[in-house]
């Protein structure tokens, strides 16, 4: 499950910041937190990874909003607020289960749409169109002008159902 978690962290950060490098930094950050099994401040993480504190904070705050890391807030002796970050098996489990739930919901909607409607696909650009839209456009793809082809949804529904069942076991 840890590998799935690391993949989720890396890809979500890379997409959010439009940078594969940020994705790799996020992966290193959570690996560090998990391997050390202790709560660390963002300054300490930045020093250990040899990256700027600003980058570390940016990544950690995004991961916190996505519930991909744990955070604790405490007051210091000089009345400043200090955040400490952690990753443990519970954080990983909750993150993966939440992502699986979101994907299951999307797959469920896709299965419902595929069972309730017929679709046509463009053989060139592979865009999918419902019957109503095909009738309005005269069976021609609005993007490339190719003739749209009817698609049997049974195989696709079966594949999606199998994926849904696998995710249900998580």
Swiss-Prot record:
Matching InterPro entries: TF_E_archaea (IPR016481), TFE (IPR039997), TFIIE/TFIIEa_HTH (IPR017919), TFIIE_asu (IPR002853), TFIIEa/SarR/Rpc3_HTH_dom (IPR024550), WH-like_DNA-bd_sf (IPR036388), WH_DNA-bd_sf (IPR036390)
Ranges for domain HTH TFE/IIEalpha-type: 1-93
A Pfam family assignment: TFIIE_alpha
Tree of life domain: Archaea
Keyword hit for Chloroplast: no
Single annotated GO MF: DNA binding
Keyword Transcription regulation: yes
GO BP annotation list: regulation of DNA-templated transcription; transcription initiation at RNA polymerase II promoter
Keywords, sorted A to Z: DNA-binding, Transcription, Transcription regulation
Family label: Belongs to the TFE family.
Function description: Transcription factor that plays a role in the activation of archaeal genes transcribed by RNA polymerase. Facilitates transcription initiation by enhancing TATA-box recognition by TATA-box-binding protein (Tbp), and transcription factor B (Tfb) and RNA polymerase recruitment. Not absolutely required for transcription in vitro, but particularly important in cases where Tbp or Tfb function is not optimal. It dynamically alters the nucleic acid-binding properties of RNA polymerases by stabilizing the initiation complex and destabilizing elongation complexes.
UniProt comment concerning the protein's domains: The winged helix domain is involved in binding to DNA in the preinitiation complex.
Subunit and partners: Monomer. Interaction with RNA polymerase subunits RpoF and RpoE is necessary for Tfe stimulatory transcription activity. Able to interact with Tbp and RNA polymerase in the absence of DNA promoter. Interacts both with the preinitiation and elongation complexes.
HAMAP family noted in UniProt: TFE_arch (MF_01909)
Protein name per the record: Transcription factor E
Native species: Pyrobaculum calidifontis (strain DSM 21063 / JCM 11548 / VA1)
Taxon lineage: Archaea, Thermoproteota, Thermoprotei, Thermoproteales, Thermoproteaceae
Gene name, Swiss-Prot/TrEMBL: tfe
């Amino acid at each position: 499950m840890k590998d799935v978690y690391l993949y989720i962290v890396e890809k979500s950060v890379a997409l959010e910041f439009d940078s594969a490098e940020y994705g790799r930094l996020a992966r290193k950050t959570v690996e560090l937190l998990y391997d050390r099994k202790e709560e660390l401040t963002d300054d300490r993480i930045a020093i250990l990874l040899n990256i700027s504190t600003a980058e570390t904070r940016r990544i950690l705050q995004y991961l916190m909003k996505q519930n991909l890391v744990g955070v604790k807030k405490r007051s210091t002796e000089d009345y400043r607020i200090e955040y400490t970050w952690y990753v443990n098996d519970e954080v990983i489990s909750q993150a993966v289960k939440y992502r699986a739930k979101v994907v299951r919901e999307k797959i469920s909607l896709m299965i419902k749409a595929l069972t309730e409607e017929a679709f046509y696909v463009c053989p060139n650009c592979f865009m999918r169109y419902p019957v109503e839209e095909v009738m309005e456009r005269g069976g021609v793809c609005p993007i490339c002008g190719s003739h749209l082809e009817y698609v049997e949804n049974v195989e696709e529904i079966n594949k999606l159902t199998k994926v849904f069942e696998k995710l249900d076991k998580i």
